[in-house]
Regions:
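Generic hydrophobic, helix-prone segments enriched in Leu/Val/Ile
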Residues: 55, 108-109
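Ferredoxin-type iron-sulfur electron-transfer modules in oxidoreductases and energy-metabolism complexes
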Residues: 79-108, 123-170
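Catalytic-loop motifs flanking and including active-site residues across diverse enzymes
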Residues: 47, 113, 163
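Conserved aromatic-histidine-acidic binding/catalytic patches
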Residues: 36, 40, 109, 159
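Conserved, hydrophobic alpha-helical core segments of structured domains
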Residues: 109-112, 116
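Structural signal for hydrophobic packing residues in well-ordered secondary-structure cores
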Residues: 49-60, 118-121, 125, 168
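The feature marks the mature, well-folded catalytic cores of soluble enzymes
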Residues: 1-103
Length: 170
């Protein structure tokens, strides 16, 4: 699975969905591997709750999303030989440490990936996500794609931007 955040004080990860798909894919297998950028690591549950106040409101206009799944290690199961699932958390750097050390660029890693900047983008509304991002969409997608994947991948995003700055106001 991915992760919306990983809580350093407990080792738990948080998954936020509306359909419960993340809960399903973490429940079924005997081995759960959660992968996320080092920018997903937050100090405490208080920080996780602050993210939960912002993410659903900006992404879908909800006060709280339908499913918030907390996972802290392997859980008991009858399907595993030793009676317990195993869990592994993998943090990806991919240039994030360098970005974290930059006082201006590090602000991009504070994005919770809610999609609000894409939802207000007139070009995104017309052409959809496949033309507006390699992995990350919207205005923040342009910045993150450039930082993590280079200017060649980000070039198409820049060419699509009409500089209306609706994303900045969102």
């Amino acid at each position: 699975s991915g992760m919306n955040f990983a809580v350093a004080e407990s080792g738990a990860i948080g998954l936020v969905t509306n359909e419960g798909n993340a809960r399903m894919v973490t429940t079924l297998p005997r081995v759960h591997v959660a992968v996320g950028g080092i920018d997903k690591l937050i100090p405490s549950f208080d920080d996780a709750m602050a993210t939960l106040r912002v993410l659903p409101r900006n992404a879908t206009g909800q006060h709280l999303t339908s499913y918030v799944t907390w996972i802290a290690g392997g859980v008991p199961t009858a399907s595993a030989p030793d009676g317990k699932k195993s869990m592994h958390v993998v943090f990806v750097d991919n240039g994030r440490k360098a970005v974290l050390n930059d006082p201006i660029l590090s602000q991009a890693l504070r994005c919770v990936r809610c999609g609000a900047c894409a939802n207000v983008c007139p070009v995104y509304r017309l052409v959809g996500g496949h033309r507006m991002g390699y992995i990350y969409i919207g205005a923040i997608g342009l910045i993150l794609t450039y930082l993590f994947h280079g200017k060649d991948r980000a070039k198409a995003l820049v060419q699509n931007c009409v500089n209306c700055q609706a994303c900045k106001r969102s």
